[in-house]
């Protein structure tokens, strides 16, 4: 069932523009599959799907093969930061990054894959990312790096 559902997900996002998990769940239901948003979310993560911009304000799900077209993780991260970040701030050892709606997970994933030594981990919502930084003295340098890449 899971492999059938994941194959269907790849077929759907390959054939049409799917912007949200709910849209994807609806397409699966139209194919007779009973799914929850949580199941779709897990499938997206397991399949390594990414969100790619289709315009300044919209993005769609894409297969990981499209991510392979970006040669380096750092290049992908720079592009994501430049194209989606709207604000950077901090509190103690946490850097907070605001993105365009729907892009926080992609940016946080790219940060995680960059293996920055000062980053302990990230937590992403729809448009907000918390980055836990250690040591606290590294916060300003990390914020400066992000701001430079955003410009």
From Swiss-Prot:
Where is this chain primarily localised? cytoplasm
Q: Which GO terms fall under molecular function for this chain's record?
A: arginine binding; DNA binding; DNA-binding transcription factor activity
InterPro entries attached to this UniProt entry:
Arg_repress, Arg_repress_C, Arg_repress_C_sf, Arg_repress_DNA-bd, WH-like_DNA-bd_sf, WH_DNA-bd_sf
Subcellular localization(s) per the UniProt record: Cytoplasm
Q: What Gene Ontology terms describe where this protein resides (cellular component)?
A: cytoplasm
Q: In which pathway does it act?
A: Amino-acid biosynthesis; L-arginine biosynthesis [regulation]
Query: GO BP, one example?
Result: protein complex oligomerization
- Coiled coil located at which positions? none
* Record key words, sorted: Amino-acid biosynthesis, Arginine biosynthesis, Cytoplasm, DNA-binding, Repressor, Transcription, Transcription regulation
One Pfam family of this chain: Arg_repressor
The protein's job, in short, is:
Regulates arginine biosynthesis genes.
* Family to which the UniProt record says this protein belongs: Belongs to the ArgR family.
Q: Which PANTHER family match?
A: ARGININE REPRESSOR
Its name, as the record gives it, is Arginine repressor
């Amino acid at each position: 069932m899971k492999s059938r559902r994941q194959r269907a997900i790849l077929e759907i996002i390959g054939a049409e523009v799917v912007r949200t998990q709910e849209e994807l769940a609806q397409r699966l239901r139209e194919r007779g599959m009973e799914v929850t948003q949580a199941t779709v979310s897990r499938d997206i993560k397991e399949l390594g799907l990414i969100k790619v911009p289709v315009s300044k304000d919209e993005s769609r799900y894409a297969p990981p093969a499209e991510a392979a077209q970006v040669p380096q993780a750092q290049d992908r991260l720079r592009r994501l930061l430049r194209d989606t970040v709207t604000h950077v701030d901090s509190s103690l050892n946490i850097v907070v990054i605001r993105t365009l709606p729907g892009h926080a997970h992609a940016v946080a994933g790219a940060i995680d894959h960059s293996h920055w030594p000062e980053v302990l981990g990230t937590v992403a919502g729809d448009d907000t990312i918390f980055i836990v930084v250690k040591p606290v003295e590294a916060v300003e340098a990390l914020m400066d790096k992000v701001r430079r890449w955003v410009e």
